[in-house]
């Protein structure tokens, strides 16, 4: 009986504390739980690109990591190698599946996120910041023009989700 009273009061306290906190959400969302950030470009294979100066940072989207589940291993390419648009450069292994990661653009790999080797879960915790995968010097910057902006990617995800049901 005491356990039931404790559980009831704890549940009530949790409802009250979560109801009183302000709710912050990203600018865009694919589904109710997947963030889509402004200022990035997106591929229909669910990778993102952040182009700054002569370097483009690439990773998988929040939508992709959400569908994969807990990431347990990341395969990354070598610095100095090259990537080709729409071609695989690595893989992400989760508790659910292993997925190839495609490059949204072509170019030379100038940096890889070596933190992912020891802490692959960074992709789940921070797909757009700490969970980036590679940095590339684009060989054809105009390829960025063929990628989706945040609004287009959000619509793409919604349509993809509707088609799956």
Curated annotation (Swiss-Prot):
Compartments (UniProt record): Mitochondrion
Transit peptide: 1-31
Co-factor binding details: Binds 1 lipoyl cofactor covalently.
InterPro entries assigned to the protein according to its UniProt record, in alphabetical order: 2-oxoA_DH_lipoyl-BS, Biotin_lipoyl, GCV_H, GCV_H/Fam206, GCV_H_sub, Single_hybrid_motif
Annotated signal peptide: none
Domain Lipoyl-binding: 55-137
Superkingdom of source: Eukaryota
Keyword Hydrolase appears in the UniProt entry: no
Record has Glycoprotein as a keyword: no
Subunit structure: The glycine cleavage system is composed of four components that only loosely associate: the P protein (EC 1.4.4.2), the T protein (EC 2.1.2.10), the L protein (EC 1.8.1.4) and the lipoyl-bearing H protein.
Protein name (Swiss-Prot/TrEMBL): Glycine cleavage system H protein, mitochondrial
Organism, scientific name: Flaveria trinervia (Clustered yellowtops)
């Amino acid at each position: 009986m005491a356990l039931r009273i404790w559980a009831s009061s704890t549940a009530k306290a949790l409802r009250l504390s979560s109801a009183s906190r302000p709710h912050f959400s990203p600018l865009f969302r694919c589904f109710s739980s997947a963030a889509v950030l402004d200022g990035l470009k997106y591929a229909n294979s669910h990778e993102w690109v952040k182009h700054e100066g002569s370097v483009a940072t690439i990773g998988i989207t929040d939508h992709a990591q959400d569908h994969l589940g807990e990431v347990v291993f990341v395969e990354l390419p070598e610095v100095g190698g090259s990537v080709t648009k729409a071609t695989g450069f690595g893989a992400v292994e989760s508790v659910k599946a292993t997925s190839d990661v495609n490059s949204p653009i072509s170019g030379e790999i100038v940096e890889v996120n070596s933190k992912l080797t020891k802490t692959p879960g960074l992709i789940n915790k921070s797909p757009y910041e700490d969970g980036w995968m590679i940095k590339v010097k684009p060989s054809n910057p105009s390829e960025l023009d063929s990628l989706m902006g945040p609004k287009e990617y959000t619509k793409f995800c919604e349509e993809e989700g509707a088609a799956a049901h």
